[in-house]
Amino acid sequence: MSKKYSEENTSSIPLTDLTSPSTGETSSQQQRQRASQQQPPQQPESNTATGSRWSNFVDSFKPAIENEKLAMRYRDANADVEEDAGGYYNSTDQLTEIQRININSSKSNLKRKLKNRHLQMIAIASSIGSGLLIGTGGALATGGPGGILIAWILSGISILCTIQAMAELAVTFPVSGGFNVLFSRFIDPSVGFSVAWNYVLQYLVLLPLELVAASMTIQYWNTDINPDVWVIIFYVTVTSINFFGVRLYGEVEFILSSLKVIAVVGFIILSIVLAAGGAPNGVHHGTKYWHDPGAFANGFKGVSSTFITAAFSFAGTELTGLTSAEAENPRKALPKACKQVFWRILLFYVVSIILITFLVPYDNPRLLGASDVSASPFVIAIQDGGISGLASVMNSVILISVISVGSSSVYATSRTLVSLAEQNLAPKICGYVDRAGRPLVAILITNVFGLLSFIAASGKEDEVFTWLLSISGLSSIFTWLCICISHIRFRRALHVQGRNTDELTFVSQTGVIGSWFGILLNVLVLVAEFWLAIFPLGEKSNAKSFFETYLGFVILIIFYFGHKLWRNNWILFIRSRDIDIDSGRRETDLEALKRELQEEREVLRNKPFWYRAYHFWC
């Protein structure tokens, strides 16, 4: 890659390597002249001094002026050129379709308004939801305390490796759509198309599902009011959060995530007291439930089933990667946020689950007696401890969690739809971003799908959502698998093209080995899911059970081969030497970047050991 100016210092000046034959001016002089004559107009400034706030509000919904369209409008009428990653223009003959897509994704009109604290809290608490607070109950019942602990520890290590790989890619290429764009870049466009659309389907279904879950959670206190009344309240709340821009989303997530973290830490402290015999009923639990009824339930099949629940509970961990295009300083904030994943897995998942196995036996009938908050092992532990009132507190935490996940589902769906539109994999209208940086059309599409939540009072919601979830039920696993593959392919491309990790602002702490481990475990989870789809736990084999479990894989295959037929491209992988590792980078002057990184390493090397340890882990 040739030396270029950094993105922040680059102006839209057509590149020419020729000296003017008539004037003898150098190309740089010509560039300055053309820049002064053809400077594209900037975004309209706020007219609060001369206009009303209402007119400013209305204007904010108008389309943002796109950098690429401006460049095309103000460049030479006879020049057939494109802007490259560093802000230069080259002949279109020199750019592949993937390079054009990569550049387009890096020039998103989304606003960089997410601060470091927003990313920190999103990373820590983004996946603390019904999977951990309720889903662990069913996993404990089917796998036993030993099975659930093994599943969450191994899955946690896999997620840690995956997030490290994602951080390396997202910091290097902070593009709209995050990791979804990188699948087409490093693996194959058909893989990117199929996995990204499955990801969209997952979160399209998740929004109404979480709204229904919120209305059902309210029924813990009151069953007289029609659930659709609560659906309306939560629907308006969640949709409003995203319509007011990414900054409000970040603030709301920061508050809700803080409450979730405080609640889980409080439960951990309470559980230690209960396990030690400090409950009002005076019962000392210790590890007796590991001996009676035992450490494992339903043998190897039971343990395998807990891996699926563990994968579901970790869904949403990758959301940090989607924020790269809207982070104020992705180079600094994203690595720090992704490092927090280790502590979240250790504290909020592993420690919580260990304490749950001390307090609730796997044969407790309430674990499988319902699918709502009453099946939460957290609530059961509090109730069995003889503590009144705290069950309502935990129910409130579950309510906060489902609202948070619902809001995040709108964010994830809308940003992924924008990236698909930028890649020409979705209708162009889906990529509409207004002057406030809001992807309005994508948000509207997501909110329209959220109207499915009004079936909450129909009595058929369980059957409807079971089939809707089956369409994209494996989406998170496919996404994590492709993140790891993309990381390995990126490192391979660096090696083949004579480059190394010295030019990366963040390098995965688990490296390529961690990505291989992530691939291995995700493949094993898919195999376990297939086995349980054919031979379900506790019932006979049947087609309905199989498709409820594995329909997502069938949908993925249809999307994949459909895209292959559409593009008539039957190449399985982009060759390593052909992978584009330059377009869309935030830092494009590699020599200056290497010097800066070396200086940072020297400064860190001179710090005390405790500081270096803190920097590594936090």
Swiss-Prot record:
PROSITE patterns named in the record: AMINO_ACID_PERMEASE_1
Main location: membrane
Biological role: Amino-acid permease that is able to transport phenylalanine.
Inducers of expression: Expression is under control of the CSY1 amino-acid sensor.
GO biological process: amino acid transmembrane transport
InterPro entries: AA-permease/SLC12A_dom (IPR004841), Amino_acid_permease_CS (IPR004840), Amino_acid_permease_fungi (IPR004762), APC_YAT (IPR050524)
Membrane topology: Multi-pass membrane protein
Keyword Transport: yes
Entry GO terms, CC: membrane; plasma membrane
Family affiliation: Belongs to the amino acid-polyamine-organocation (APC) superfamily. YAT (TC 2.A.3.10) family.
Top-level lineage group: Eukaryota
Annotated segments matching region Disordered: 1-55
Stretches with biased composition (Low complexity): 27-40
Name of the gene: GAP5
Keyword field: Amino-acid transport, Cell membrane, Glycoprotein, Membrane, Transmembrane, Transmembrane helix, Transport
Keyword Transmembrane: yes
Subcellular location, record wording: Cell membrane
Positions bearing carbohydrate: N9, N90, N104
Residue spans of biased composition, Polar residues class: 8-26, 45-55
Protein's name according to its UniProt entry: Amino-acid permease GAP5
GO MF term (any one): amino acid transmembrane transporter activity
Transmembrane segments: 121-143, 148-170, 193-213, 229-249, 254-274, 302-322, 341-361, 397-419, 439-459, 465-485, 517-537, 546-566
